[in-house]
Amino acid sequence: MAKKVQAYIKLQVSAGMANPSPPVGPALGQQGVNIMEFCKAFNAKTESVEKGLPIPVVITVIADRSFTFVTKTPPAAVLLKKAAGVKSGSGKPNKEKVGKITSAQVREIAETKAADLTGADVEAMMRSIAGTARSMGLVVED
């Protein structure tokens, strides 16, 4: 028989930097999960990723207080800011442009996000990523 799921917890945790402080500690402690066990497992799983990059994680808490977790790819906005070399997006993206990004960089980000995005093909994912870039005030160049 399948184990009974108690809760799903969705968090964004910096790669290789999970620790018991908020937001990780309170979210897991509320469900009775061993916080240090999660932190060690998460840090081990994300050691190949650039340190400090926010990684979305979905933690499945089982009724016996054990857990499993699935990591996703970093948010597209974070990858776009990193590729463009900007600190933050534009407050007025239709008027003020904050940076430029090439279509090759958009393709690279789309291929990175391919596991998480439900787009039919790379071209569709590229259009989605380009739309995100435009909404952040980035210019997509060919």
From Swiss-Prot:
Function, as annotated: Forms part of the ribosomal stalk which helps the ribosome interact with GTP-bound translation factors.
PTM description: One or more lysine residues are methylated.
Gene name of the record: rplK
UniProt xrefs under Pfam families: Ribosomal_L11, Ribosomal_L11_N
Single GO molecular function: large ribosomal subunit rRNA binding
Cysteine pairings via disulfide bonds: none
Gene Ontology, cellular component aspect: cytosolic large ribosomal subunit
Signal peptide start-end: none
HAMAP family registered for this protein in UniProt: Ribosomal_uL11
Name of the protein this chain belongs to: Large ribosomal subunit protein uL11
Keywords linked to the UniProt accession: Methylation, Ribonucleoprotein, Ribosomal protein, RNA-binding, rRNA-binding
